[in-house]
Regions:
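Gly/Gly-Pro-rich "capping" loops immediately C-terminal to redox-active cysteine motifs
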Residues: 24-28, 32, 37-71
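Bacterial signal peptide processing site
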Residues: 17-21
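Bacterial N-terminal signal peptides
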Residues: 6-16
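C-terminal capping alpha-helices of c-type cytochrome domains
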Residues: 69, 81-101
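Surface-exposed loop and edge beta-strand positions of immunoglobulin-like domains
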Residues: 41, 79-80
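Positively charged n-region of N-terminal signal peptides that target proteins for export
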Residues: 1-5
């Protein structure tokens, strides 16, 4: 009986760890902390170009967006060493959701 209670408790703990926030929520957090200052809270642009629906960014492939973030063309800061691939994927997923694609 003791073993089955321990197994149930362990499975609940492990299961809870698997149900973290969606990558879209993670993407919005990354955008808010690293991108909003230049690209705006509504992705309409500002210091940096617009990223929302109908923008040039909306025509880029996912890989092109990742490359832009990593390289930081023009006046944009390079985020090459700041984001993991999983974080980049989450950020692209967030942008695509906001762009309606």
């Amino acid at each position: 009986m003791r073993m089955s209670v321990a197994a149930i408790v362990l499975s609940v703990i492990v299961g809870a760890g698997c149900s973290g926030p969606s990558s879209d929520v993670f993407g919005v957090d990354l955008y808010s902390s690293s991108c909003v200052h230049c690209h705006g809270g509504d992705l309409a642009g500002g210091i940096g170009p617009a990223l929302g629906p109908g923008s040039g960014a909306a025509t880029l492939t996912d890989q092109q967006i990742v490359d832009v973030i990593r390289i930081g063309p023009g006046a944009m800061t390079s985020f090459r060493d700041r984001f993991t691939q999983a974080q980049l994927d989450s950020l692209v997923e967030f942008l695509r959701a906001e762009q309606g694609s």
